[in-house]
Structures are given as structure tokens and as C-alpha cells.
Curated annotation (Swiss-Prot):
The gene is xylA. PROSITE patterns: XYLOSE_ISOMERASE (PS51415). It is an enzyme of class 5 (isomerase). GO terms for molecular function: magnesium ion binding; xylose isomerase activity. The lineage of its organism: Bacteria, Bacillati, Actinomycetota, Actinomycetes, Micrococcales. Homotetramer. The active site is at H54, D57. Pfam families: AP_endonuc_2 (PF01261). This is Xylose isomerase.
Length: 397
């Protein structure tokens, strides 16, 4: 398999990722700001297909209309010259001091109204650029102190805002869906909708739930100690995987934003296997952008920035290659059958069977030989996982 990225791979990068200057809570920038035109040109040369951005990545918070339009025009020119697309746009409701207690859920009602206006304006820009997804990461929606935030009221204000946005895109006729990005903490001590499961439950309370899905990020779910691949399976099961953020994370700690695959490599392997081979008939289960939300390490210069961008795509393609070999291995197929992996898709009840029928079925309980599972009838899961790891390590062809 070719390891050179192409537009068909649908790799995309956030402008805030390749444009990260290295500043962190303990030190200032180690690199200069990246111009948006250079960013578009370089990711195009590397084989990406898309660029995403927050409004404040493209033009500074508080920019005049003229300054804003200048940057939009420059971006449009670069997109036209390179063929790069904008599949997703988002709004920064976390950096400016006005959002220190959040945007949609700030205790200050005037701030909430300002946040909605900021988002509505950026939705218009997303539609203008042809973006199909609008991501909402509520990085400041939360609290450090239990007494400081009425969570019930905050969730109602969150719901009110998202319902309004759904009305807006519907009335405007925009072909845009929303994707909530969960995160357990950082920058707030506790963030509302901290995990994929919380977000999925919240979506079901909305007036237009069909317009809202999730944008899970590898590191965010792993910060909560969760299995990212399992979470993606549930999002796919519920038809809510509208976008995905790929990066690397090594355990329960701060949000590292490493290159994809440079953290939990085994989980990255199972994720790529799911995305590429987990659909009906073994095809793709998700056909949207493979979006890299990472930070080039603070230690790197501009050469290292582009090396790290290329590394994300190469890691994904390497894992895709390993996953395809894993699926094609006859020994793996035998191990999958022995583990009865496919049997989970067989309904537990027979067609038309009720609880009366299963209660009357002696083979399901009275005559079922449960004792035969002691010292026998192992599932062979360890063998299957060993085969997966050997393929991941390139030990099997």
C-alpha cells in the first residue's frame, strides 16, 4: 500500500495546530506566527485535503470588519490556488477574557448573548466557505467550584443555545451539522459534557437532535481513562460520528496533543481498523475527514512543524496498512471465528420470540450445561490480541 497521502485519504489539519507557536502555561512562544496562506500551501504540498479553523485563528478577536474580510479573502485565494477545502469550522469561545466563565453557559447573561452572536456570524462564514460541519468545544463551559455553577441551569442554557443554532441553519437553508467535542477538564477544573457518553445523552434532549452529533478527540477521551475505539463504536452505532479529532495521548494527564499514534499505539491501531474496515462488508465505517488536532512539540522549529504534520498522515497510513494485513490473515480469520466475534450480531432472541417463549425454552436454562464452561470453552481472546499486536509490529506479513 502507498504511504504517500492523497486527497482521497481526506486528511485535514486545524490552523491552530500547524500554527501552534509553542506557548504553554510555563513559557512563551518558541516559534513565529504562521500565515494562513503559507499554512494552506504547505499542507497541500504534504498531501492533505482540508484546513479547519476557529474564527480567531484566521483574524484576531476584535478585528474590524475590514481586517476580517482581508483575511477571509486571503484564505479564499489560497484555497482556490491549491484545491484545499474547508470541511469544518469552529468558534473560539474560550480565549478572550470575556469568556473566562464560558460562552453559552456563563453565569453572566450578557456574555451568553455575545457568545451566540459570535457563533452565528461564524456559521455564516462556514456556509460561505462550504463547510459541512460546525464543531462546538466548550472549553470554558464548566467550573472549578461546585457552589459556583448551577449545572442543571447551565445545561439548560447550553440546550437553549444549540437549539437556536439549529433553528438558524435550518431557516437559512445551510447544509451544516453541529458536532459537540467533549473533554473532561482543562482549561476548566471540570467541563460540562465531559465525555462522549455525556454528549450523546445531551443531544437526545435537543429540539433538532438530527442536526447534532459528536466530534470525539483521542486525547480527550483517554484523559478520562476511556477506550477511544469503544467510544467511536458507540458514536457510529448511534449515527452520531459527524467528525473526529486524531492525536496521541499517553495516559491520564494533561492534554498532550501528540502526533497521532505517538501515544497509545495499540488503541490507535484498533481505531484505524474500525474506521477503515469496521463497516458493513468490511468497508469504511466512517467516510468523513481524518482530522489531526495535535500540537507540534514546543522543542521544534518550523521544519519540525511540517515533519510532525507529515508524521500524522504517515502514521495513519502505516496503521491502515497493518490493519488491512491483519484482516486478510487466514489465521486471524480463524481466531476471530474461534472467539465467536461475529456471533454478537446474531439476535439473542429468535424472530418473533417473546419472554414467554424463552421462559418455556428448557434448553436456555434448565438443560443448559453452564458447568461445561469451567476448565473449558475458552474464547481465545489473548491469542487474537497477540495476532493483532504481531501485525501492528510488522512481525507478520
Amino acid at each position: 500500500m502507498a504511504l504517500t497521502p492523497t486527497r482521497e485519504d481526506k486528511f485535514s489539519f486545524g490552523l491552530w495546530t500547524i500554527g501552534y507557536t509553542g506557548a504553554d502555561p510555563f513559557g512563551g512562544p518558541t516559534r513565529s506566527d504562521l500565515d494562513v496562506v503559507e499554512g494552506v500551501e504547505r499542507i497541500s504540498e504534504l498531501g492533505a485535503y482540508g484546513l479547519t479553523f476557529h474564527d480567531d485563528d484566521l483574524f484576531a478577536f476584535g478585528s474590524t470588519d475590514a481586517e476580517r474580510q482581508t483575511q477571509i479573502d486571503r484564505l479564499k485565494g489560497a484555497l482556490s490556488d491549491t484545491g484545499i477545502v474547508v470541511p469544518m469550522v469552529t468558534t473560539n469561545l474560550f480565549s478572550a477574557p470575556v469568556f473566562k466563565d464560558g460562552g453559552f453557559t456563563s453565569n453572566d447573561r450578557a456574555v451568553r448573548r455575545f457568545a451566540i452572536r459570535k457563533v452565528l456570524r461564524n456559521i455564516d462564514l462556514a456556509a460561505e466557505l462550504g463547510a459541512k460541519t460546525f464543531v462546538m468545544w466548550g472549553g470554558r463551559e464548566g467550573a472549578e467550584y461546585d457552589s459556583a455553577k448551577d449545572v442543571r441551569g447551565a445545561l439548560e442554557r447550553y440546550r437553549e443555545a444549540v437549539n437556536l443554532l439549529g433553528d438558524y441553519v435550518t431557516d437559512k437553508g445551510y447544509d451544516i451539522r453541529f458536532a459537540i467535542e467533549p473533554k473532561p477538564n482543562e482549561p476548566r477544573g471540570d467541563i460540562l459534557l465531559p465525555t462522549l457518553g455525556h454528549a450523546l445523552a445531551f443531544i437526545e434532549t435537543l429540539e433538532r437532535p438530527e442536526l447534532v452529533g459528536v466530534n470525539p478527540e483521542v486525547g480527550h477521551e483517554q484523559m478520562a481513562g476511556l477506550n477511544f475505539t469503544a467510544g467511536i463504536m458507540q458514536a457510529l452505532y448511534q449515527g452520531k460520528l459527524f467528525h473526529i479529532d486524531l492525536n496521541g495521548q499517553r495516559g491520564i494527564k494533561y492534554d498532550q496533543d501528540l502526533v497521532f499514534g505517538h501515544g497509545d499505539l495499540q488503541n490507535a491501531f484498533s481505531l484505524v481498523d474500525l474506521l477503515e474496515n469496521g463497516g458493513v462488508g468490511g468497508g469504511r465505517s466512517y467516510d468523513g475527514p481524518r482530522h489531526f488536532d495535535y500540537k507540534p512539540s514546543r522543542t521544534e522549529d518550523i521544519t519540525g512543524v511540517w515533519d510532525s504534520a507529515a508524521a500524522n498522515m504517515r502514521m495513519y497510513l502505516l496503521l491502515k496498512e497493518r490493519a488491512q494485513a491483519f484482516r486478510a490473515d487466514p489465521e486471524v480469520q480463524e481466531a476471530l471465528a474461534a472467539a465467536k466475534v461475529a456471533e454478537i450480531d446474531t439476535p439473542t432472541l429468535n424472530e418473533g420470540e417473546s419472554y414467554d417463549d424463552i421462559l418455556a425454552d428448557r434448553s436456555s436454562y434448565e438443560d443448559f450445561a453452564a458447568d461445561e464452561y469451567f476448565d473449558a470453552k475458552g474464547f481465545g481472546f489473548v491469542r487474537l490480541n497477540q495476532l493483532a499486536l504481531e501485525h501492528l509490529m510488522g512481525a507478520r506479513s
